[in-house]
């Protein structure tokens, strides 16, 4: 057992003391094991506390239990102003008046040192450890047993209510015993923590658990076990939809394991009968738990199709680590209806890469159709370097369109040739000012370059359309002048070069006349100034 000496007044500023091993501890001023600064009447060495191992239990709280590792505690007065002990029975003894100036202390006794300002309570801190077995043949190591006995603690063979800590070995595989420790809300630490206590005799605080968190194996994943206060609220706000408990690895303990962490559980039968405005919360907070052994069978229920899913073992990892990452959640499946598919592909205007700078297509009219569907027809614009073949109902028959920009006449249809093709002529003014054309491609449209020996096909070996094999038109890409200035094909055409020349001549002549006038003005002004300065000018002026 660990003993504690705590100040009765927590606001006094005095330290707490924890005693882990037997020995003699001095009480007094600076340099002693237990330092008292509040009372000026405390001597340099005021008293001595002696802890001896005994087979007799010193705890009044559990008189029926016999503990082989308890202590007998005695206080001896060595001061001038005395040491006083007040028991739970109400008696107050002056230690310096007793025989040998000693008194045996028990759990709950109040000790006053000096004039009575420094008052402490002796308290028993029970430490009962349960070593979680990693296998059926697990045995406690002898060094661990010795460390537990040296601090006055003991090891419980089973996980009971009196157990204060659960000790684990590093990288232990998760089993039923560990799940029961989580359900019992016990502090889970490594066995090294007990070894640390055994090395100490007295300290002002019990060592923390942060550096002694165990790591457990959940199948192949290594998970750190966090503190109880972190685990108990890690799943708060979630409602988990469960299959029958026998389909999960930990059986009936699995729903309780989730509830210990703040979550709610509901079975498939319960959620089938409840309404949308149920007490289980919003639908986006409900998650279906997929058993590892049975797999995902929630798809057979239509009302569960919009719920996210999580694997059973991922949820077990969240219970130990105190965190359910969003990456562990499996989003619901989205059904895409057949109406999303299209029969035609429309290619909007885009900046196509220039394949050949020597050729350009000013306009493509792909909306023309053949007059007779039975016989393939073609629309030809003379001397075109590009041919577009459009597949008809028969995969072996194609419609051919030859393109060329005619700059001489207005667009119209003038004749039909012997091959049932139609020649279309269009004027340059009819084309779009941007210099680009709108082309509507159907599903089976093929673009071919007649000057290139390489064949470009839009269908694969199985008749599947391959849109990536289209060749882009010869349109200037980037910030071309026609794109930036669409309102003027020839920006200098609207200015008359002769008018500009005449204007420049007149402007030059005007500046010359101004310069001459300025020179004459300055000359006349200088002459008058010289005349006025002379005596002759002054006399002639008078």
UniProtKB/Swiss-Prot annotation:
The places in or outside the cell where this protein is found are: Nucleus; Chromosome
A GO cellular component annotated for this chain's UniProt record is: chromosome
Keyword Cell cycle present in the record's keywords: the answer is yes
Q: Which residues cross the membrane?
A: none
Q: Biological process (GO) annotations? A: cellular response to ionizing radiation; DNA damage response; double-strand break repair via homologous recombination; mitotic G2 DNA damage checkpoint signaling; mitotic recombination; reciprocal meiotic recombination
Effects seen without this gene = Hypersensitivity to the DNA cross-linking reagent mitomycin C.
Start and end residues of each stretch annotated as Involved in MRE11-binding: 465-500
The intrachain disulfides are: none
Q: Which segments carry the region annotation Disordered?
A: 409-430
- Domain named FHA is located at 25-90
Tell me the InterPro entries matching this sequence: BRCT_dom_sf, FHA_dom, Nibrin-rel, SMAD_FHA_dom_sf
Q: What is its main location?
A: nucleus
User: What are the alphabetically sorted keywords of the record?
Assistant: Cell cycle, Chromosome, DNA damage, DNA repair, Nucleus
Q: Where is the BRCT domain?
A: 119-195
State what induces this protein: By X-rays.
Subunit architecture: Component of the MRN complex composed of two heterodimers RAD50 and MRE11 associated with a single NBS1.
PANTHER family, A to Z? NIBRIN, NIBRIN-RELATED
* Similarity section: Belongs to the Nibrin family.
Task of the protein: Component of the MRN complex, which plays a central role in double-strand break (DSB) repair, DNA recombination, maintenance of telomere integrity and meiosis. The MRN complex is involved in the repair of DNA double-strand breaks (DSBs) via homologous recombination (HR), an error-free mechanism which primarily occurs during S and G2 phases. The complex (1) mediates the end resection of damaged DNA, which generates proper single-stranded DNA, a key initial steps in HR, and is (2) required for the recruitment of other repair factors and efficient activation of ATM and ATR upon DNA damage.
What domain notes does the record hold? The FHA and BRCT domains are likely to have a crucial role for both binding to histone H2AFX and for relocalization of MRE11/RAD50 complex to the vicinity of DNA damage.
Q: What is this protein called?
A: Nibrin homolog
Instruction: Supply the source organism for this entry.
Output: Arabidopsis thaliana
Gene for this chain: NBS1
């Amino acid at each position: 057992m660990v003993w504690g000496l705590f100040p009765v007044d927590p606001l006094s500023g005095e330290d707490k003391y924890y005693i882990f091993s037997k020995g003699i501890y001095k009480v007094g001023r600076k340099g002693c094991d237990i330092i008292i600064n509040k009372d000026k009447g405390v001597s340099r060495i005021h008293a001595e506390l002696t802890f001896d191992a005994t087979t007799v239990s010193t705890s009044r709280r559990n008189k029926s239990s016999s503990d082989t590792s308890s202590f007998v505690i005695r206080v001896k007065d060595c001061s001038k102003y005395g040491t006083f002990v007040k028991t739970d029975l109400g008696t107050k003894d002056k230690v310096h008046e007793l025989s040998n100036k000693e008194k045996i202390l028990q759990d709950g006794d109040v000790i006053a040192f000096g004039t009575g300002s420094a008052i402490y309570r002796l308290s028993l801190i029970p430490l009962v450890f349960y070593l979680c077995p990693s296998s059926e043949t697990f045995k406690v190591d002898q060094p661990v047993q010795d460390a537990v006995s040296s601090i006055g603690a003991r090891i419980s063979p089973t996980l009971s209510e009196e157990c204060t800590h659960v000790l684990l070995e590093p990288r232990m595989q998760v089993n039923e015993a560990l799940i029961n420790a989580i359900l019992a809300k016990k502090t889970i630490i490594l066995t090294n923590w007990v070894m640390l206590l055994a090395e100490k005799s007295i300290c002002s605080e019990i060592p923390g658990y942060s550096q002694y968190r165990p790591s457990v194996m959940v199948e192949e994943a290594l998970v750190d076990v966090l503190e109880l206060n972190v685990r108990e609220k890690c799943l708060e706000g979630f409602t988990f939809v469960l299959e029958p408990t026998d389909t999960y690895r930990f059986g009936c303990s699995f729903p309780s394991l989730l509830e210990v962490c703040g979550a709610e559980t509901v079975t498939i039968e319960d959620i089938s009968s409840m309404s949308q405005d149920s007490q289980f919360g919003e639908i986006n907070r409900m998650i279906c738990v997929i058993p590892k052994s049975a797999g995902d069978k929630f798809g057979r229920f239509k009302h569960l199709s919009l719920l996210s899913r999580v694997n059973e073992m991922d949820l077990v990892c969240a219970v130990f680590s105190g965190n359910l990452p969003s990456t562990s959640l499996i989003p619901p499946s989205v059904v895409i209806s057949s109406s999303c598919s299209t029969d035609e592909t429309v290619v909007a205007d885009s900046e196509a890469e220039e394949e050949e700078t020597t050729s350009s297509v000013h306009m493509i009219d792909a909306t023309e159709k053949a007059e007779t569907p039975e016989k393939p027809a073609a629309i030809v614009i003379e001397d075109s370097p590009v041919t577009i073949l459009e597949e008809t109902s028969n995969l072996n028959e194609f419609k051919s369109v030859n393109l060329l920009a005619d700059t001489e006449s207005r667009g119209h249809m003038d004749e039909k040739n012997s091959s049932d093709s139609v020649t279309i002529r269009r004027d340059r003014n009819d084309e779009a000012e941007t210099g680009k054309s709108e082309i509507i491609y159907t599903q089976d449209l093929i673009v071919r370059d007649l000057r290139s020996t390489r064949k470009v096909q839009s269908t694969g070996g199985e008749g599947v359309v391959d849109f990536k094999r289209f060749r882009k038109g010869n349109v200037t890409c980037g910030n071309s002048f026609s794109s930036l200035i669409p309102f003027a094909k020839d920006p200098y055409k609207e200015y008359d070069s002769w008018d500009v020349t005449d204007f420049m001549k007149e402007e030059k002549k005007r500046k010359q006349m101004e310069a001459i006038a300025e020179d004459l003005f300055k000359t006349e002004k200088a002459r008058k100034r010289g005349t006025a300065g002379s005596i002759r000018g002054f006399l002639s002026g008078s």
